[in-house]
Amino acid sequence: NGYHQLEMVMQQILLHDDVAVKWTEALDEGQDRKGEAPVTIRVSTNKPWLPRDERNLAYKAAAIMTEHYGKGLCGEIRIDIKKRIPVAAGLAGGSSNGAAVLHALNVLWNLGLDVRQLCALGSSLGSDIPFSIMGQAKANLELGLSKDRLAAHCALATGTGTELEPLSCGLKSYLLLTKPPIGVSTAEVYGG
């Protein structure tokens, strides 16, 4: 399946994308044949070459939230991504965008999901998403999850990367981040 067993420390850094999510409710417009109103998903980004459809993890995150919690909803999810994290650099840029969408819809739809529940949803989309959920829960006080026992800036990741144990100490170090002009996908790195 392309996944490998690992043991590593994951640490948040200050580099981030800006992800804005807006929910606009529609009133009984565009119902399908079963009388159920659909939820549409639209993604925009400052990078014209980034996918805006189901190939994008932010889109996939909105789709999984709609599948699990969107029954009876009618409206549009608009996701605007301003990329700063280099793509194909091993920095979980797409994963963090997906995590941000899960958090946003949790708040916008008043679902009250905790970090564990969000991580369970996120792990079905990718191995880096649960850690991104944990880090965003700790860093973004507006989410109301910073006191959750799984909210953390640093974690020990085992298994395929989705088994996470928060580390309260974090890594205290300086970091120089460089990105060469090439990119390698996670699937290529772990594909062997």
Where are these regions (language model features)?
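ATP-binding N-lobe of GHMP and related small-molecule kinases
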Residues: 1-89, 107-112, 143, 170, ...
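ATP-dependent small-molecule kinase catalytic core of the GHMP/sugar-kinase superfamily
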Residues: 2-9, 111-192
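Predominant activation on well-ordered alpha-helical scaffold segments within soluble catalytic domains
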Residues: 7, 59, 63, 99-102, ...
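DPxDG-like acidic metal-binding loop motif
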Residues: 58, 89-116, 127, 131-135
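N-terminal hydrophobic or amphipathic segments with adjacent small-residue motifs
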Residues: 84-88, 104, 120, 153-155
